[in-house]
Amino acid sequence: IHAEQAAGFDLNAACSGFLFALQTAQAYIQAGIYRTVLVIGVDSMSHMVDWSDRSTCILFGDGAGAVVLRESKEGLFVQAAHSDGAKGDVLTGCSRHRKNWDHPDEAKAAYIQMDGQSVFKFAVRRVPEIVEELLEKARIQKEEISYFFLHQANRRIIEAAAKRTGVDISRFPMNLQEY
């Protein structure tokens, strides 16, 4: 892209990485450091899954997307970033464990492992809370939002979160069935 006056760095945070990168880009723009930022999100997870474990292999794959953010006086960008370290054992693998191919049990521990029920409950509880937080920060009402774009991991999570948020599911676009 011949960007001679540019900086580049890797921000690695799995599913949340693209959102953290957007927040970082917005902060650079808001601080006046850059006027235009290219954010590229890439996940390469297929080598980290146990293909015999249907609870994870259907959820974690490879993909990429990009967006260009520019300085603008129009529009709205509010953000919220949360984590819960107490839930660290709910989704583990790869960086936490080394693969030891000589010992199959140890090699299996290196793959992504997830307590799907806990992830489901957490997401369904937290998404409506975060939607309310963002609406409050933006000083707008749910009715003013055309679409709510959620992480495309699980249709049931999105449907349950929409119901708990009190917003019709038609305003939560989904494309997971295509992948």
Where are these regions (language model features)?
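Acidic-glycine-rich active-site phosphate/pyrophosphate-binding loop
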Residues: I1-H2, L38-M45, R98-D105, I157-I169
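Conserved catalytic cysteine-centered active-site region
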Residues: I1-T36, K163-Y179
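Acidic, glycine-rich active-site loops and adjacent beta-strand->loop/helix elements
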Residues: A13-S16, G41-S46, H82, E178-Y179
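Flexible, glycine-rich active-site loops centered on histidine and acidic residues
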Residues: Y28-A64
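Condensing-enzyme catalytic core mediating Claisen C-C bond formation in acyl metabolism
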Residues: D53-K121, R125, E129
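Phosphate/pyrophosphate-binding loops at sites that engage ATP/ADP/AMP, CoA/4′-phosphopantetheine
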Residues: E129-S146
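Glycine-rich phosphate-binding loops at beta-strand->alpha-helix junctions
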Residues: I145-R164, Y179
